[in-house]
């Protein structure tokens, strides 16, 4: 059974790229066509690259590795936290702290401090202190929880990282590359494919697209964990109820089993979550 279907990708708006004036020429090979000034990503290639990334993640985890989930943009925060938590992997969905990978020894000390403060709060360690001291300690704990809560159990740098939007997460990407940590990431039409080891061409601005692809990676982790434990297959992402496809999108879907052809019908209105900038109706 396929890891994910063409229909699921279309339903989630994974095929919508940025406006044609905002692109990285290196992404040309991943572009199928453009419609009304918006690039349309070649989902046939997306499916192929998903399979490659899925296999890599599954094998990495099956052999004892870990995957860090990274996505701090608003559209990705919820799915990053949910899917990483589901499979017990570390995640960063708030601000990326410089040195989180390259200076992990210092970060680990801050994690120990977080656990120390939590233990104090739970065991009555705040008793006997002034209100001001308790307030300061509570603020410190909350700040550490917000920035490091997703990696609280991480004992070493991850084996690979999953990234939603390599442009926004350029610090994480740079640190991973410096340490030769493999990068799996969504590649929108404004991204640089040269910085990613396992690219997945797709829309990194739509909530449903980011959620679907993050779920795919988490499912690969789950399957790897089961293989590590000697179990069966992991849970594959399930199709969700979606709006009817526009006629041109149906043509893309119909062409999935044949040679792709440019669609000629007018595009439908994509989901409201595809674009976060108020000046453009679709992923710019």
Curated annotation (Swiss-Prot):
GO terms for cellular component: cytosolic small ribosomal subunit. Residues 250-284 are annotated as: Disordered. Residues 250-272 have a biased composition (Low complexity). One of its GO terms (biological process) is translation. Keywords: Ribonucleoprotein, Ribosomal protein. The keyword Ribonucleoprotein applies. GO terms for molecular function: structural constituent of ribosome. InterPro entries: Ribosomal_uS2, Ribosomal_uS2_bac/mit/plastid, Ribosomal_uS2_CS, Ribosomal_uS2_flav_dom_sf. The keyword Ribonucleoprotein applies. Belongs to the universal ribosomal protein uS2 family. This is Small ribosomal subunit protein uS2. The lineage of its organism: Bacteria, Bacillati, Actinomycetota, Actinomycetes, Mycobacteriales.
